[in-house]
Amino acid sequence: MKIYSYNELKTRFAEYAKPGEFSITSADTFRIIRLHYDEKQGCLFAFCNTNIEKRVLQFYFKVKLNLYSYKQCYDKHIFPSCRNKCISYTTFVAPGVEGNCLNKINVIKYERNKAAPSDNAACLDKFLHNVNRVHMQTPFVEGAYMRFKKTQRCQNNYVGGSTTRMFNLQHFYEDFELVDEMTLTSGIMPVLSCYDIETHSDGHNMSKASVDCIMSIGFVVYKNDEYARFCFMYHKLPTEIPETHDDDTHVVMFQNEVDMITAFFDMIKITNPDVILDFNGDVFDLPYILGRLNKTKMLLKRYDLPAAAPTTKLFINKLGNKVDTYYFNYYIHIDLYKFFSSDSNQHKVENFQLNTISSYYLGENKIDLPWTEMVKMYNTRRLDVIAKYNVQDCMLPIKLFVKLKMADSVYSQCILHRLCTDDVICNISHLISVACFYAAITNTRINESTGKEEPDPYFFNKNDLSIISGQFNADKATAGISNLKRKLTPLKNIPKDAINLGPANQTVKYKGGKVLQPRASIYKNAFSLDFNSLYLTIMIAICACLSNLVLCEDGNVYLNHNSRAIVVKLLLKLLSERCKFKKNRDNQSESAFLYDLYDQKQNSVKRTANSIYGYYGIFYKVLANYITRVGRNQLRRAISLIEGLSNDPEILKKFNLNSIGFKVVYGDTDSTFVLPTFNYNEIFDETDTLKQICTHVETRVNSSFTDGYKMAFENLMKVLIILKKKKYCYLNSENKIVYKGWLVKKDMPVFMRIAFRTAVEQILRHLDINKCLQSLQASFYEYYDEFAKSKPMTDYSFSMTYNDNPGKKRKSADDNNEGPSPKRRVITVARHCREILVNKGTDFVPGNGDRIPYLLIDIEGKVTEKAYPLRLFDPVKMRISWIKHMGILCTFMNELLEIFGDEQKDNLAKCFTAIMQKYMQNQLYDRKEPVLVKINQKKCSVKRKRDDDDDNNDDDDDDGCDSSDSENDTQCANNTYKFCLYKIKK
């Protein structure tokens, strides 16, 4: 750790991002890292990186171009030509039948840089960023590799083109060459940075920007595989920090807080990162910095360009809560917390705190420095430890960004789908909207007379989606598409192969995929046959596209069978691209760079294709329902075909068997679990022969399908345990154990998950209930004895997602006759714990979507009242309550009872009682014991009323399953008893 004055630091890093004059030849490849369009100048700024002599060199160039947007023309068009020079496009949503008065929208294409701000704010493509438009209208794309056609001279990081003219779009192919990635041997990465602030407080309440200062700003830059570490610290009193030789952090002390913040902004310009990362910066760091600046504007500079203030855009997270997102114009800004919490692929981590994510992906943790201790250190001017803590918090996000190859992931979306780097945290529906907009406006058709492709543009009007989804209606489920202003098509003009989707004004209730009700049991040597991309295949087969919807005079909506529809062509293109990318990826035996590149691209294409069904579920549930209906029929047909192969002569002859039966013991949406029954003494190599039988069944079933439907043999399950719908686990032929829906819930303490899985493993590997119960008891005893000792406290905690707006509005039949009732404030466990954290003034206050870890303390009251945040739990001063842990154990013991039946009830009761006695021995309140009770069969089918104390609504049971499809829906129970917890009588 070295201490500098700020002027010394500026001098030391003056040349860090200024390589002086250098040449970029026609052989030097560069990558567009960031694009920024200035509407006032009508100019595109391209920020680029190139690798020369194993160093990253940064530069930018300008391109003169006009960017276009679209607005609706409201002229009455009484004359042959429109004074606004509008173009008539076919509507993307419900255009009608080709050749029978297609519905049109008149659109004016105009130059954004010459338009009034009000026009740009109200344009039809307002959901796009300017860089999305650049990607659609020019060859410049973020993440693309390029070369200059002629050698260019770079001065002060600027490449100006020739002496006679600046770069412009009309001369693109004279000035630039697009580079095929297949010809590259290594990638060009952006320069990364991350910042983090530490704030002061009175030690009792959370920091407030109006009162509490910023103690320090950590800032780390990652360039050329090296880190440059900075810490800007503020203290109103003169303070000395001891220097150390084992840490190369550059520390600068300030006695004026605004000077410190300004110096931080200045250091961003000096070090010139391409990407600025933070963690929860949109919610905490940036608003706090702005609050401390008071009336001073936050301005970011880059090169010799005019300083620009960040812009904000409202972001709605998956819980429906609204948060501002900050964009940095010349820089890429990514709030990694928002990225992880909004990415559906990150469901494996326990929560989205930096420590948890870093531990999971990097095996590294933050420095353990309690916030109250940090404030004490600051007050006594011991700032060196705070600096180390602050800088470490900046290192971890950069390491995560590199480890997860996030740059290639982001750029793949830009190149493939016309997204931009500012779309990195946008939801999947935005991705599909951008892809559909571009596909519609550039749509082509084959001219039957010439055989050539010619333009056939449609216009994607996002306002139509709001109408058909019912967004503008009080009752969102009804009359959506009937509110579209469309000419109705006569019934006689509806094609005969069109599908009737029902009345346009129908009430829509979503119905998911088919799920069979299984019998809880253990199965040996079952195998799974799954459909390959079932919903994608259905959408292509039925031509599911919003441009195929037809509103008919008979009041119904029809789905036209037009295979040239925009989304159908998009799906076929995506599937083709994925096959190509996977093939290219698998051919990369020598280049790790190309392998990763193609892997990111195939993942991006897969994610987009798989999201289109969900897109219909958001905006037009009628079409989504029809897709799932076809899926249910295909699953029924598959089950019939599989079971119809029982005692098939060809199979008997091929495998020398006297008899064989196939029974589908479970099915879910697109998969089947099949149990083959035959005399195993008739086969030689059990595993190999079973795999051959599975492959043969796959071939026979697929030979009966048409329209591209295919099933694939996925797993041979040596032992399969099915508990209920969507809850099972198995040991596959590679000796790997897989859990699906069972023992995976995040609200269950880690130690219980470990104990349960270890116990279940004894069944899967040894088929031994006694080993299972011995393992379970030993694990629970160990974790009880080591509580607050060798085992981390996080292993014992529960967690619940915090949401500002919990629950749904429920109305009774009598509510219509009464006035509005006062809104009742719902106190969930998460809200209760958050309020405690706020009142205690902790360093991290969870926001919407955060999972809050908590324990129960042994006091009198309901679960909510007992809940206490783990961050503040002190095992020396507080006594834990185990009652919720034992409730989860009770559920698990009942699950084992369902699987094994009544004959094992005594063994289960003995184990359960021993564990309960251990955990209840020092507890004062809610002391309970397990009791076996007879199940009242009449009440088996009655849905359990929600317990007031059951505040965790994170159940993942039966989500989206087709509960109304009663085929094979009667559960056959193995047990007539169940465990209940009763209070111990004093």
Curated annotation (Swiss-Prot):
Keywords for this protein: DNA replication, DNA-binding, DNA-directed DNA polymerase, Early protein, Nucleotidyltransferase, Transferase, Viral DNA replication
Q: Which SUPFAM superfamilies match?
A: DNA/RNA polymerases, Ribonuclease H-like
The record's EC number reads: 2.7.7.7
Q: Which residues cross the membrane?
A: none
UniProt record, GO biological process: DNA-templated DNA replication; viral DNA genome replication; viral genome replication
Q: Catalyses which reaction?
A: DNA(n) + a 2'-deoxyribonucleoside 5'-triphosphate = DNA(n+1) + diphosphate
Enzyme group, top EC level?
transferase
User: Does the record bear Transferase in its keywords?
Assistant: yes
List the biased-composition ranges (Acidic residues): 948-968
Q: Where is this region: Disordered?
A: 804-824, 944-969
Q: Which Pfam families match?
A: DNA_pol_B, DNA_pol_B_exo1
PROSITE patterns given in the database record? DNA_POLYMERASE_B
**GO molecular function, a single term:** DNA binding
Q: Which family does it belong to?
A: Belongs to the DNA polymerase type-B family.
Quote the function comment for this protein. Answer: Replicates the viral genome, host DNA polymerases cannot substitute for the viral enzyme in this process.
- The name under which this protein is listed is DNA polymerase
Highest classification ranks of the organism: Viruses, Viruses incertae sedis, Naldaviricetes, Lefavirales, Baculoviridae
